[in-house]
Amino acid sequence: MAEQTEKAFLKQPKVFLSSKISGKGKRPGKGGNRFWKNIGLGFKTPREAIDGAYIDSKCPFTGTVSIRGRILAGTCHSAKMQRTIIVRRNYLHFVKKYQRYEKRHSNIPAHVSPCFRVKEGDHVIIGQCRPLSKTVRFNVLKVIPAGASAFGKKAFTGV
């Protein structure tokens, strides 16, 4: 089980902890003392979500959040918050008067499950879900490390 650091007892709502039989299930959410699911949309469930011991009700793989709506990609701009990052999306806006493009960006806060290790500069794919807080409406689905992608910590990488 996860380390109990909160005042309330942390547990997954769909797992019965007092079971006399403990076996690892091979199908999503079946057997064992850990609930996990396949979110679909072509995204694989991370090994850390299946084998890990963390408890996160807002995790799309082990929690009660479903991914629906938009799937976006961007670069992690800030990872200073707990379990939340800022994803920067760069784009070009056409100015009709001058027949030119100008650089613009948008910042999107997204929840990060503890099964991911995200650093600034990493390329992430996020999916829309129900509102998780006042500003957070997206969840991280996949992380591509900064060294593995062509993107970096640069402010604007172009389109």
From Swiss-Prot:
> Which of UniProt's keywords are assigned here?
Cytoplasm, Ribonucleoprotein, Ribosomal protein, RNA-binding, rRNA-binding
An example of a Pfam family matching this protein is Ribosomal_S17
Q: Which PROSITE patterns match?
A: RIBOSOMAL_S17
Q: What cellular component GO annotations does this protein have?
A: plastid; ribonucleoprotein complex; ribosome
Q: Which InterPro entries match?
A: NA-bd_OB-fold (IPR012340), Ribosomal_uS17 (IPR000266), Ribosomal_uS17_arc/euk (IPR028333), Ribosomal_uS17_CS (IPR019979), Ribosomal_uS17_N (IPR032440)
Give me the disulphide-bonded residues: none
| Presence of keyword Cytoplasm | yes
The Swiss-Prot or TrEMBL record annotates one GO molecular function as: structural constituent of ribosome
The lineage's top-level taxon is Eukaryota
Provide a GO biological process annotation: translation
Subcellular location per UniProt equals: Cytoplasm
Q: Which NCBIfam families match?
A: PRK08572.1, uS17_arch
Q: What family, per the record?
A: Belongs to the universal ribosomal protein uS17 family.
Q: What is this protein called?
A: Small ribosomal subunit protein uS17x
Source organism (scientific name): Arabidopsis thaliana
Q: Which gene encodes it?
A: RPS11C
